[in-house]
Amino acid sequence: VEWTDFERATIQDIFSKMDYEVVGPAALSRCLIVYPWTQRYFGSFGNLYNAAAIMGNPNVAKHGTIILHGLDRGVKNMDNIKETYAELSVLHSEKLHVDPDNFKLISDCLTVVVAAQFGKAFTGEVQAAFQKFMAVVVSALGRQYH
């Protein structure tokens, strides 16, 4: 993947301003609520009965934060994203048996949460850079499935 200077700077800027402990839980909660079939991968998380339960679930919040810290690894290794996520791809495909389409769903939910957080600063150009980064990460996570 080729990154422009603008894309690199934009991705680094977004992640430097993001509160992982707010954005991560919000994105994962949104995914579990909007796409309820994704809940099947989180059976050990306890009560996911309704939106309020999901948003108040400490296990969802913790895993949402873990997801953001995982994305931070990609930000720090933008020239080596496939290798950065090789082990996570194996884990999600071979051990957890996660449908790789779900990576795109969480990516879309994260984009919505980030856009809401950044407001007018999340311009079309910024969104394009963010979604390009997320598409590369989604591809890397799904790599083991191919």
Curated annotation (Swiss-Prot):
GO CC terms, sorted: blood microparticle; haptoglobin-hemoglobin complex; hemoglobin complex
Assigned keywords, A-Z: Heme, Iron, Metal-binding, Oxygen transport, Transport
Domain Globin: 2-146
One example of a Gene Ontology biological process annotation: hydrogen peroxide catabolic process
GO molecular function, one term: peroxidase activity
Tissue expression pattern: Red blood cells.
Family: Belongs to the globin family.
Function: Involved in oxygen transport from gills to the various peripheral tissues.
Name of the protein: Hemoglobin subunit beta-2
Source organism: Anarhichas minor (Arctic spotted wolffish)
